Amino acid sequence: MSHEQISLNSDVIESLKEQFAEEQFADNPEPRCPVVLIYDCSTSMWGMDGDDPKMRELMRGHELLQDELVKDLVARERAEISYITYGTQVSEPTLFTTPGEINDIKEAEADPTKDTTHYKYLNTQPVFTDMVTTSTNQALLTAIETIEKRLEKYGSHPHYAPMIFLVTDGMATDHNAPAPGGNQTLLEYTINRLKEHIKFDEKGRPEKGSWVFLPVYIPTGNPKTDADIKKSLSIYPSAPAPEAQPLEPGNILSFFQWISQSVQNRSNSRTEEALAFPNPSNWLMPSM
């Protein structure tokens, strides 16, 4: 039977993922820096013909981020990234993997002498496809739950405060959906869940250990629409920026380089240190 013909049931796949997670800590005792990147893959990101430049640039930025981080000898072992793509539905988050692990998988898959069949079941790379509408709240909740589960896996293993980055081009379509329990809207529930992890002192500065959450949006070029998008995203508590930030069209690659440098700065610091973010001027749209 060829490798392509092998099909595993869900229990075996979960066992493979669990084994992979256990080996991660046995093979690499470094402190971990958990990062979740959330990619809006709704139709507006793809364009009506499915070939919008901003989605092409986002996918190139995704590859650039991995290539940049693997070059940093510290970040490649400490940064752990999970990716979430979303639209009407939210994809299963990819496994938390270090840039070094991703590089090892790519090298193994390029070696015809190695049996890498099991890698396709590990879910380490996002799938980019048109996912229609924009369930941003559900995507954020998925990110929070994914990090919480990862922190449980860490146990006493040293780690940095988690980081979440959201890239979108529009307003959420699930604000008024019912939240679990039915007593709140999904928007209200998401805000409260973020507040559990993003906390500020009396001067409005992020507290020590507070999570990083940065929502960025790609402007449409229509001032009113862009103002509405910014307002809708700025409802969420965020840090280090107090509101959503506009990502200048055409500078998406620069944004991913900025994320890479931010993650490298975090990974090369002590776990209790405040994060020093690089200057965002290369990607931030001015006067927004």
Which residues does each predicted region cover?
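VWA/integrin I-like adhesion module and closely mimicked acidic/polar interface patches used
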Residues: L8, F128-T134, Q138, E145, ...
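Von Willebrand factor
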Residues: P29-Y160, M163-V167, V212-D226
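Short, hydrophobic/amphipathic alpha-helical packing segments
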Residues: L58-D67, N137-I144, F256, S260-V263
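Von Willebrand factor A/integrin I-like adhesion domains
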Residues: L122-N123, K208-M288
